[in-house]
From Swiss-Prot:
Family as reported in the entry's similarity comment: Belongs to the ClpX chaperone family. HslU subfamily.
Functional note: ATPase subunit of a proteasome-like degradation complex; this subunit has chaperone activity. The binding of ATP and its subsequent hydrolysis by HslU are essential for unfolding of protein substrates subsequently hydrolyzed by HslV. HslU recognizes the N-terminal part of its protein substrates and unfolds these before they are guided to HslV for hydrolysis.
HAMAP family assigned: HslU
GO biological process: protein unfolding; proteolysis involved in protein catabolic process
Database matches in InterPro entries: AAA+_ATPase (IPR003593), ATP-dep_Clp_protease_ClpX (IPR050052), ATPase_AAA_core (IPR003959), Clp_ATPase_C (IPR019489), HslU (IPR004491), P-loop_NTPase (IPR027417)
A Pfam family of this chain: ClpB_D2-small
Family matches, as Gene3D superfamilies: 1.10.8.60, DNA helicase RuvA subunit, C-terminal domain (1.10.8.10), P-loop containing nucleotide triphosphate hydrolases (3.40.50.300)
GO terms for cellular component: HslUV protease complex
Residues holding ATP: 18, 60-65, 247, 312, 384
Name recorded for this polypeptide: ATP-dependent protease ATPase subunit HslU
GO molecular function: ATP binding; ATP hydrolysis activity; peptidase activity; proteasome-activating activity
Subcellular location: Cytoplasm
Length: 434
């Protein structure tokens, strides 16, 4: 779990996302509160529940990007899902409890990676012995092994091919579901799980010494880990630090004056209620309590309104954050300021062909102006419009770059207008092309 202060979290998000200070503040406080809660004594810790967040804002302003960057920062099990993927319990499709099962799987991978680092040194030695067995045989003399060990560590044998025995990963046993079993979609029931490893099925692989390194270290690390303890730790991490980002929540709103049942809408909202409020979900690894999992929901709400959500669901998302539509200045900053801005990406891509791309300041102004103009006349899709405009402007350069190695291509305002100006002015054409 990260122990960044809210100010540090915001400054980290600022490296990649332009504007939206309110949303950044809200998620940074929520993330810090996770850490604060863990510092409390056990009795009070149980009572402090997370304040779930609802982010409201037009498409393309940074809601999903905030979630993506937060996931990398959090150092906690994090899952981003679209609310539209789920159906009401009892219908064909995924029910919302699958969110928690997926979150547990994410946590298990995270905990395993962390624990592998703790046993890396021992695993490295065991893996080295297995490589030497493959190279010179298990019964070779100590002198021979030492000679090959020195060559191995010096990297002289990296390209040599060897045969290694590795654990067969799944695929050998069919999966089946037990009808009527609650949560039968727990990833189904594997016959391999029921009968154990059946003597540990292995397969022989032919790989180079260099590529065998990671395979064998991972396998030897797993032998040194206690899987049951690892799973219990992962469940504990999910229950205390888990974060779920529910995107497109506005798409499961039931709008006023709509009649008739809708499998993927109100029923999904009703199923989400206990999950967000706090319930116990059965997974194949054990029961998981959701009381302290943080839920961040987001939606554009350009057709539905937040008030169209079930009142109970609104009450379970107490913190509301409104993200602002992007202005021309925001568009300009998005093109230049983030660490991996669009301009930097295109310059780097062209450099691989030996072409130097020189995009002037007035070209950046023109690109921002066109993106804002098209957004206002056609459909406001926010910063995503910049990608469409950039692709259109640089289409000719991208196509011919491989024939222009060593050249410098200058893109100024006149170049931008020449390649896209007329399209942007013609609303009917830009509706289909930009």
């Amino acid at each position: 779990m990260t122990d960044f202060s809210p100010r540090e979290i915001v400054s980290e998000l600022d490296r990649y996302i332009v504007g939206q200070a309110d949303a950044k503040r809200a998620v940074s406080i929520a993330l810090r509160n996770r850490w604060r809660r863990l510092q409390l004594d056990a009795g009070l810790r149980e009572e402090v529940l997370p304040k779930n967040i609802l982010m409201i804002g037009p498409t393309g302003v940074g809601k999903t990007e905030i979630a993506r960057r937060l996931a990398k920062l959090a150092g906690a099990p994090f899952l981003k899902v679209e609310a539209t993927k789920f159906t009401e319990v009892g219908y064909v499709g995924r029910d919302v409890e699958q969110i928690i099962r997926d979150l547990v799987e994410v946590a298990i991978v995270q905990v395993r990676e962390r624990k592998r680092k703790d046993v890396a040194a021992r695993a490295q030695l065991a893996a080295e012995e297995r490589v030497l067995d493959a190279l010179v045989g298990a019964n070779s003399s100590a002198a021979t092994r030492d000679s090959f060990r020195r060559k191995l560590r010096a990297g002289e044998l990296n390209d040599k091919e060897i045969e290694i025995e590795t654990q067969s990963s799944g695929g050998g046993f069919p999966m089946f579901e037990i009808p009527g079993m609650p949560g039968a979609q727990m990833g189904a029931i594997s016959i391999g799980d029921i009968f154990g490893k059946l003597g540990g099925r292995t397969k022989t692989r032919r790989v180079t010494v260099e590529s065998s390194h990671d395979i064998l270290i991972a396998e030897e690390s797993d032998k040194l880990l206690d899987n049951d303890q690892l799973v219990q730790e992962a469940i504990s991490v999910v229950e205390n630090n888990g974060i779920v980002f529910l995107d497109e929540i506005d798409k499961i709103c039931v709008r006023e004056n709509r009649h008739g049942g809708d499998v993927s809408r109100e029923g999904v909202q009703r199923d989400l209620l206990p999950l967000i409020e706090g319930t116990t979900v059965s997974t194949k690894h054990g029961a998981v309590k959701t009381d302290h999992i943080l839920f961040i929901a987001s939606g554009a709400f350009h057709i539905a309104k937040p008030s169209d959500l079930l009142p109970e669901l609104q009450g379970r998302l107490p913190i509301r954050v409104e993200l602002q539509a992007l202005t021309r200045d925001d568009m300009r900053r998005i093109l230049t300021e983030p660490e991996a801005s669009l301009i930097k990406q295109y310059v780097a891509l062209m450099k691989t062909e030996g072409v130097t791309l020189d995009i002037t300041d007035d070209a950046i102004d023109a690109l921002a102006d066109i993106a804002v103009a098209v957004n206002s006349t056609v459909e406001n899709i926010g910063a995503r419009r910049l990608q469409t405009v950039m692709e259109r402007v640089l289409d000719e350069i991208s196509f011919t770059a491989s024939d222009r190695s060593g050249e410098t291509m200058r893109v100024d305002a006149a170049y931008v207008q020449q390649h896209i100006g007329d399209l942007a002015k013609n609303a009917d054409l830009s509706r289909f092309i930009l």
